[in-house]
Amino acid sequence: MLLTLIRDTFTPSETLGKLYIDRKFFCDTIEPPVVPNAQHPKGCIPLGWYKLQLSVSPKFGRLLPLLYLVPGFQGIRIHAGNNRDHTSGCILVGELYHRHGVPGTTCCGGESGGIGRFNERGAVSLCDPIVERGVPTLCHSKLTEQALVDKLKNETNQHEELYINITDTDRYPVERAILDGMSNLADCK
């Protein structure tokens, strides 16, 4: 299963994008701004391919996707939030009411605009198609990210693996052409 996040709007205060599941649009995203050579919490995570795992978040107390082996970052989750101030380095999912600095959009309130309709539904509904595909779930809320990575390395996984490709509008057409030529996602490793 492949999630693709395409970043398409960059401002000094936030990065906006669109999240796709197996190339079908799923929702909008908000992340921290792009900061060259960023280390959490200054900017968003670097472009690239990352493995995902569903696990119970100690902070939120429910099943959420966790990106792991992200250079310079730990505990990067995909979860709901209302605006860029709620990212803490994570990827917020929802439906954008306002694309900051983009003419012709509607602001839902506040200078930063916001993301709505996903306060409780967003990340939970993102988990639904993942669980339906048989991707394994870790329900160990007390595991650190390193313990989670170690556990995953030691398990033989016969289930479908979950990846996220974080890219931008300049790189995506080339990546898509490459993916179209591959027989399966395992070729990406």
Where are these regions (language model features)?
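Cell wall/extracellular polymer interaction/catalysis modules
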Residues: 1-188
